[in-house]
Structures are given as structure tokens and as C-alpha cells.
Amino acid sequence: MSMQDPIADMLTRIRNGQAANKAAVTMPSSKLKVAIANVLKEEGFIEDFKVEGDTKPELELTLKYFQGKAVVESIQRVSRPGLRIYKRKDELPKVMAGLGIAVVSTSKGVMTDRAARQAGLGGEIICYVA
């Protein structure tokens, strides 16, 4: 049986890995997952990521902790295969009054809600991270 929502699986692996105090989590890789991992790294929610393997690439995320606590308090899927959520630039949400981020897939690539607002772009809201 094939996986229905690989992005939700990625977010669940991050959530479960931090709940179990794992140093890193691995998952099958895709271009979208790498783009999301890049946004999470730039925003300081994960330590690092790397892609290994040629025939079946694996994405390894190094999780980040601060004083023994997980940096990611909550990570939540918004747009899903059964119900896509699109927002215009003026409708982009502010997560936790600007303390968290919304990961947005735009025509110019995957970016945070702040970067999309600055670029004047709307798009699909992939997830909220706080």
C-alpha cells in the first residue's frame, strides 16, 4: 500500500523523534521534503539535514534541542491531499502572533509566510510550525 500523504508522514516523524529525544530522524526523500527541511533549518527549527543514497534517497534531519527541550513545540499539517488550502498574500496567517511560521508553497518555491508576504506572493499553506 502506498503512502497517502508523505508530508504529513515527515511532520509526524519530526514530532515523534523529538518526543522520544532522538538526535536525528530519517525518511524517504523528495524535492518538496528537502525544500521544507531547508525552510525549517533557515528558521532554526532543525539543526541540519542531508540527503543520502542514489536509487532510493533518504532524507536525514538532525533535530534541535534547547536546554533539553525540543525547539519545535508544535508542527501541524494544514493543506492535505483531500483538502488543499490556498491563501492570497493578504490572507496569509500569522502563527502564534508571528512567533511561529507557516510554510508556504508559492510559484517561487517553498518559503515562510513572512518571506511570501515580502515577495507579494500567495500559495498553498503546507504546515504551521511553532
UniProtKB/Swiss-Prot annotation:
BP terms from Gene Ontology: cytoplasmic translation; regulation of mRNA stability; regulation of translation; ribosomal small subunit assembly
Keyword set, alphabetical order: Repressor, Ribonucleoprotein, Ribosomal protein, RNA-binding, rRNA-binding, Translation regulation
Transport keyword on record: no
GO-annotated cellular components: cytoplasm; cytosol; cytosolic small ribosomal subunit
Family: Belongs to the universal ribosomal protein uS8 family.
Keyword RNA-binding: yes
Name of the featured protein: Small ribosomal subunit protein uS8
Subunit structure, as described in the record: Part of the 30S ribosomal subunit. Contacts proteins S5 and S12.
Primary role: One of the primary rRNA binding proteins, it binds directly to 16S rRNA central domain where it helps coordinate assembly of the platform of the 30S subunit. Protein S8 is a translational repressor protein, it controls the translation of the spc operon by binding to its mRNA.
Gene Ontology MF terms in the entry: rRNA binding; structural constituent of ribosome
